[in-house]
Every structure is written in C-alpha cells, then in structure tokens.
A protein has these predicted regions:
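Positively charged n-region of N-terminal signal peptides that target proteins for export
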Residues: 1-8
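Short, linear, compositionally biased motifs with a strong N-terminal bias
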Residues: 14-15
C-alpha cells in the first residue's frame, strides 16, 4: 500500500510540474526571450522577444521597454511565397508588455510613427530564378518608390570592360553592377 501511494504522489507531482511548465509557454506563437544584463548586480537588463512563424523564421522582434516612455518597440519581417525576405517594416510602439502584436496594429503603428507614410517598410524584389538574387531594393518611404537600388548580374564581355593585367575568357567572370538611388553605377 505504501509503494502504491508513493507512485500516485510521484505521478501527481509530475503531472503538476508539466502543467506549470506548459503555462509559461505561449500557446499561440513560438518565441525566444533573451535578457541581456547591463550591470554586474543584475539590477538592469534589456529584454528582447523574437516571435517566429510556423516555418521557424523570425516574424516579429520586440525590444521590451526600450522607448523613453517605457513602451516596447516592435519590428516586423514579412516573407514572400518562396521564403525570401520581402518587407522589413520600421518599428512601431506597443503597450509595453512584450506580447505579440497583431499585423494590422503593427502596420498602422509603423505608418503613424513614420509621419503617416504609406510605405514604412524596405521592400526587396528578387529575380525569377533558383538563385534568389535581389534585383531591386526600394527604400523606406513613398519618396523612394521611383528610386530603387538595383542590381544587375553580369559576366565578362570583351566589349564592356578593359582588363589591363588579367586575361579572363569571356563569360567566366561574374560581376554585379549596383545602381544607387541617384542612378550611379558601381561595379563589383
């Protein structure tokens, strides 16, 4: 009888411990919470919570209590259908509790923090190939829609470059022509 009671108590205590552990984990979103202590006596710390989508990619980053009025700063990362970074949003303020912020609230908060701009995000366009190389990157704000940074992937052509010291056969050298917002090209 004593052994049976001991086993029942053990099973009940394990059940209670598992329930306590489950109550500490968010049931709606996956996240990793990080604390960085800023003083040796652990009196001050910075806390950051990174929420992940269903595929394990970071979707929201919450810097807890980082604004002057002790509110959270939340950043959003959106992905396209192929898992590439599509839009990186400017941060928005939230209530200050480190919780996940709904997408619509975050988008309107980022827009209001950016002075009402309708494009408070950086947007990247990729080429339609399995290499997933970016071809254009539009800066934050409506003013930069017509002035993207563009990337052109080129191979060596005997007519396009003069090579003084190197003998490279045509088509063997891959380079990138980056055109900035003002239309100035730079070759890499």
């Amino acid at each position: 009888m004593y052994k049976l009671m001991k086993r029942i108590y053990l099973l009940l205590s394990l059940l209670l411990c598992s329930l306590l552990c489950m109550s500490q984990v968010s049931t709606s979103q996956n996240y990793i919470s990080t604390r960085t202590y800023t003083s040796p006596d652990q009196s001050g710390c910075r806390e950051q919570v990174v929420y992940f989508d269903g595929l394990g990619r970071p979707s929201q980053t919450v810097d807890c209590g980082i604004t002057p009025d002790r509110k959270d700063l939340v950043s959003l990362q959106e992905y396209d259908d192929q898992g590439r970074k599509l839009r990186t949003w400017l941060p928005a303020k939230s209530a200050g509790n480190g919780n996940y912020m709904p997408l619509s609230s975050l988008q309107s908060g980022a827009s209001s923090l950016a002075g009402g701009d309708v494009r408070p995000y950086l947007q990247t366009t990729y080429e339609a190939s399995p290499l997933n190389r970016p071809v254009a990157q539009h800066g934050v704000g409506e003013a930069w829609v017509e002035h993207p940074v563009s990337y052109q992937y080129i191979t060596r052509d005997p007519r396009s470059f003069s090579w003084l010291y190197y003998k490279i056969p045509s088509g063997n050298f891959l380079g990138v022509c980056t055109t900035d917002e003002d239309g100035n090209p730079a070759y890499e």
